[in-house]
From Swiss-Prot:
Cofactors (names): Mg(2+); Mn(2+); Zn(2+)
Name of the protein: NAD-capped RNA hydrolase NudC
Gene Ontology molecular functions: magnesium ion binding; manganese ion binding; NAD+ diphosphatase activity; NADH pyrophosphatase activity; RNA NAD-cap (NMN-forming) hydrolase activity; zinc ion binding
Lineage of origin: Bacteria, Pseudomonadati, Pseudomonadota, Gammaproteobacteria, Enterobacterales
Coiled-coil positions: none
Chain ranges for the short sequence motif Nudix box as given in the UniProt record: 159-180
Subunit structure, interactors included: Homodimer.
Residues annotated as binding a divalent metal cation 3: 174, 178, 219
Residues binding a divalent metal cation 1: 158, 178, 219
Binding, substrate: 69, 111, 124, 192-199, 241
Known function: mRNA decapping enzyme that specifically removes the nicotinamide adenine dinucleotide (NAD) cap from a subset of mRNAs by hydrolyzing the diphosphate linkage to produce nicotinamide mononucleotide (NMN) and 5' monophosphate mRNA. The NAD-cap is present at the 5'-end of some mRNAs and stabilizes RNA against 5'-processing. Has preference for mRNAs with a 5'-end purine. Catalyzes the hydrolysis of a broad range of dinucleotide pyrophosphates.
Encoding gene per record: nudC
Amino acid sequence: MEREIVSIDAGWWVVSEEHKIWLPAGELPHGDAASLGLAGSSGSRIGEWQGEAVWLIRGSRPDDMGSLRQLLDRDSALFRLAGRGIQLAEFFRSHQWCGYCGHKMHNSRTEWACLCHHCRQRYYPQIAPCIIVAIRRGAEILLAQHTRHRNGIYTVLAGFVEVGETLEQTVAREVMEESSIKVKNLRYVTSQPWPFPQSLMVAFMADYDDGEISIDRKELIDAGWYRYDALPLLPPAGTVARRLIEDTVALCRAQEENGER
């Protein structure tokens, strides 16, 4: 999997360490290893984009180390591949020693895994499933400002799946815990790898069923029902939250134009 990068290796380059990524001029570097000063590094091919290889090099550069969020408005396939590189880099960084016996780990030569030659344990990259749900009530959508978002953005509700839960149970629990309402008519929409740090966002739409909004102030600053044509500041394009909101707005508009509720 990992080998020495030679001068003629070319394509797109994910250079990552501690959740940061090398973004000279705000872009994912593209070109051959020689011109980018990457020849001689250890690297792995992690995918392909626009017919060219995407490479991962685990490490940092003196300048221009930034956040993957800077690529949110780029092609979604490129964003996912860059996110894959960041997650793999962090996985290998955090699995240098075996959690069972404490001996040094070795990277597998055939798959994305770390191996312990002493106790034979095998570790794979962990992914944390997370639900995210847009809730509609007539021509309104439930939006909330989270405590972790101090930029005024309002978004839909989300939360991590707990041990032993189904995705449907997680939706019901998270919505109740954060807003004190019940939902019905749950529909799967899409999913999005979200490497902040290693989530898989599983997106749903749902309809309001019962209850009055009462927020968990450890999680939310504010929450309310907003008409589809009078929305607050929203998450950026490229996020699954924005996709859910836009899909709900389209549904609200279509049903209102048809005289439905």
